[in-house]
């Protein structure tokens, strides 16, 4: 399915969307979190500001301009199996400061940053209304996220959407990640009476959410609010 279907969610058309999902006979809705329901860009910006201020950085925007694309690249490498989660977490901040000729302990910085980002639970406008509508329609709602357990758990606890979820499946805790089929297989093992034909994956990432759903044999909806062209093989 194309992005227009889920794009309507952020225009207070949750009831219409719920009706469409009902027609398609889904029961289990698997939502990606970051960039789908949780506003990661805002969360990251606030957390980085506090973190960099603590480190005595004065040129905060300059550091952000380097870190943000570098971090995205590391997450892409993780999705493709080029690096491990430990490498990503424990080296991204040492790489950041090394770029500015400053030596820092990456693992120590990771823990400090984690304290800031875990407090950020910002969601997109309309997210709670959508989930409320789907909950009233008796869907089982689950989170399916690639991320760090302490961070994602903290952010959800600080959000207004946590009560709508039956469970949050986090890649670090599961020992596997999207787009691996094993990620979805482990989800299926933990949900009572789970049926692939009644499950729908909803997310913003073609390479993680949609490709992962394809690998596992699930239907999916690509959340594409920026109306990006799909130039991938997915």
Task: Tell where the protein language model's regions lie, with residue ranges.
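N-terminal helical cap/lid subdomain that shapes the substrate entry/recognition surface
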Residues: 23-125
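Secondary-structure boundary/capping positions in well-ordered alpha/beta enzyme cores
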Residues: 58, 103, 138, 194-195
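Asp-based, Mg2+/Mn2+-dependent phosphohydrolase catalytic module
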Residues: 7-12, 17-29, 132-135, 142, ...
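A generic structural signal for short
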Residues: 81, 118-119, 140-141, 197-198
């Amino acid at each position: 399915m194309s992005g227009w279907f889920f794009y309507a969610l952020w225009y207070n058309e949750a009831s219409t969307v719920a009706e469409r999902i009902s027609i398609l006979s889904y029961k289990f809705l698997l939502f990606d979190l970051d960039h789908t329901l949780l506003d990661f860009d805002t969360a990251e910006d606030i957390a980085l500001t506090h973190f960099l201020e603590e480190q005595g950085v004065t040129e905060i925007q300059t550091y952000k301009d380097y870190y943000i694309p570098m971090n995205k690249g590391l997450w892409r490498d993780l999705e493709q199996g080029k690096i491990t989660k430990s490498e990503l977490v424990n080296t991204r901040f040492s790489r950041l400061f090394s770029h500015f000729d400053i030596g820092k302990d990456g693992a120590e910085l990771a823990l400090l940053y984690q304290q800031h980002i875990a407090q950020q639970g910002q969601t997109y406008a309309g997210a709670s209304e959508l989930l409320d509508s789907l909950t009233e329609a008796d869907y089982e709602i689950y989170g399916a996220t690639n991320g760090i357990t302490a961070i994602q758990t903290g952010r959800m606890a600080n959000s207004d959407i946590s009560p709508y979820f039956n469970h949050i499946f986090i890649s670090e805790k599961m020992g596997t990640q999207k787009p691996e089929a094993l990620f979805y297989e482990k989800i299926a093992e933990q949900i009572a009476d789970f049926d692939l034909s009644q499950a729908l994956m909803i997310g913003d990432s073609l390479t993680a959410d949609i490709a992962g759903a394809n690998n596992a044999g699930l239907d999916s909806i690509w959340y594409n609010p920026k109306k990006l062209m799909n130039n991938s093989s997915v």
